[in-house]
């Protein structure tokens, strides 16, 4: 028994050795920056012209200023609105395509090709997508030219000067970039469902809609929860598309300014105290959402 125990210890030693590179990278690039961010959030540290103010310890003053300032609530509303405008069509489209291409009864050909094509937008850089949409929807772009030629409008419509259309473009771009990833996840979940359940439902005379709502959707619950929460976390971190499309201004009338763009403004102006406080708030929100995912998926496993 002692010899066997010694062998187990020796084998486990290699597991710990292989973990060392990950631990080192995590400490350098994750843990130390996190501690530094929390530390800086309690200090007044910014540039006033060419003069460096601080660092001076101010306690929770940065957090109080952050929440007393009305800007954070405006940008939180913008961030959540952009996420909702993107996620609702994204999840509907992904569910429809996933159910369509994973349905054994339809026996559609070319599903492998479809899986590749639908994921391609996810590989395109946000900067390239933004420049493409900026060109397409500019005043002299092809979309305005086409609408004027068919007589739908008389003068070029300023898509980026209207809050609704600007938000719509950002939501559309994010939907196109990420719906492929969601579709693949849902398709994998649907294809993992036991086909005998569908066969039994067919024998009982269930319609396609009844099968989808009563069998497919309930069994997809863990994956749907994962998709919703990860999408929400991604929505909180929305930055690249509106930053490039509006050149960091969040126009028109700050309607496309997100929380991460707000954070970037503080970092660009070297207001490290406020940037640290905002980062900590976002970190706490992300941590709470991650805990929700863990609890829900854990409950599903225990029920299973």
Segment roles from a protein language model:
Residues 1-4:
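N-terminal leader/signal peptides at the extreme start of proteins
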Residues 7-304:
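A structural signal for multi-pass alpha-helical bundles of membrane permease subunits
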